[in-house]
Regions:
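N-terminal export signals
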Residues: 5-25
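Blade/loop signatures of beta-propeller domains
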Residues: 27-44
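Surface-exposed loop and turn segments in beta-propeller and other repeat-based domains
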Residues: 44-53, 136-149, 187-198, 286-309
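Beta-rich, blade/repeat-based domains predominating
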Residues: 53-67, 98-111, 143-165, 195-217, ...
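Conserved beta-propeller blade signature
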Residues: 70-72, 114-116, 166-167, 217-219, ...
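Blade-loop segments of beta-propeller domains
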Residues: 79-82, 86-109
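Loop/turn-rich, solvent-exposed surfaces of beta-rich toroidal or solenoidal domains
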Residues: 246-292
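Blade-level signature of beta-propeller repeat domains, shared across WD40, Kelch, NHL, RCC1
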Residues: 313-344
Length: 344
């Protein structure tokens, strides 16, 4: 799905609305979400700031740096990057030139942390220092032979390999994954829109799975197909991880687990029907936050959907060094990120 159609289909339901969860959050209230050993206590106030001074539009993605700080990426050009401490206190902001800021990836490059920002509007991927100094800009991938103009390329996410190779997901364009070396030189492309196993449909996210240390692989979102797909690092298709009913965003791996925001439920499209899903090391769903309890039939999950009106359109999750989870939401009334703390 291209970015223009994606916005048009969803904006009717949510444009301009200020929204709050369908719960009371008084002093003594507590909302616990999830299943099995992945249950969390919800805090909707964690990231709130003075909207006049530090506004957000869409809260797209979040990462934690080595100092323990939480970085939020928004497409609000007054402050594209907002930096919090783990208690939700504002530390710093930067960025005024990323109107389509969408994907945020952190990478440790020879001891220095760098960021990769995907900008939908600029049709570029921008590499920066942790404080916003630009280091590299990747333009539209004409080297692939698959694109005739920048507008056809709408990157949504990156993943960076240990050798510095850059994988860019063109999730709102032609659904290719484009691989570059650390210098930004083109290596190959794969995926692309289609109905074969190796193809993708809304390749919204990508990450590198190091859970099998000797055999890292790529896990790539095929959101409109409600699944992740696994590929070799050279782009060869391996398998599909089916998640019926779940419009999953990027996969985020922490320890043995894979976490993902689910933008919306298939049975309630464009009705603020998102939730969060968690998979174990065998890529089996073990918990859905604000969603159905996971049930498997013949090795595949039964259709999953939102069961509690907590989130609107969750767009990303960030897991910190204490296993807390932070949720960024798209097109959700300019809400700031939520925090969820593990419940034992």
């Amino acid at each position: 799905m291209n970015r223009k159609n994606f916005i048009q289909q969803s904006s009717v339901a949510a444009a301009g609305m200020l929204w709050a969860p369908a719960f009371s959050f008084g002093k003594n209230d507590e909302v616990v979400l999830g299943h099995n050993n992945k249950r969390y206590r919800l805090d909707t106030k964690w990231g709130e700031l003075d909207a006049a001074k530090y506004p957000v539009k869409d809260c797209h993605e979040m990462v934690q740096d080595s100092k323990g700080r939480i970085l939020l990426l928004t497409n609000e050009t007054k402050n594209n990057v907002i930096i919090y401490d783990k208690k939700g206190k504002l530390i710093d902001t930067w960025g005024t030139t990323y109107p389509g800021a969408h994907g945020l990836t952190l990478f440790n490059e020879n001891g220095a942390e760098v960021l990769f920002i995907c900008d939908n509007n600029r049709h570029q991927v921008i590499k920066t220092t942790i404080d916003g100094r630009e280091l590299l800009v990747l333009d539209w991938p004409k080297e692939t032979g698959m694109y005739t103009k920048p507008d056809e390329y709408i990157p949504t996410e990156t993943a960076i390999a240990s050798n510095g190779d850059i994988y860019v997901a063109d999730g709102y364009g032609k659904d290719f994954i484009i691989q570059y070396n650390y210098k930004g030189e083109y290596i190959r492309h794969f995926g692309g829109r289609g109905d074969k196993d190796e193809n993708l449909l809304n390749a919204h996210g990508v990450c590198i799975d190091y859970r099998h240390k000797k055999h890292p692989t790529l896990i790539i979102t095929s959101r409109q197909q409600n699944c992740f797909k696994r590929y070799t690092m050279e782009g060869k298709y391996i398998e599909t991880i089916s998640l019926p009913g779940a419009w999953v965003c990027r996969p985020v791996i922490k320890g043995d687990y894979l976490y993902a925001a689910v933008l919306q439920s298939k049975n309630a499209e464009w009705k603020q029907s998102g939730f969060v899903t968690i998979l174990d090391k065998n890529n089996k769903v073990i918990s859905n936050l604000a969603g159905t309890a996971p049930v498997y039939s013949k090795g595949v999950p039964e259709e999953m959907y939102q069961t509690e009106k907590v989130f609107q359109y969750p767009h990303d999750v960030c897991i910190d060094d204490e296993e807390n989870m932070y949720i960024a939401q798209w097109n959700s009334g300019h809400v700031y990120p939520y925090k969820l703390q593990p419940v034992s």
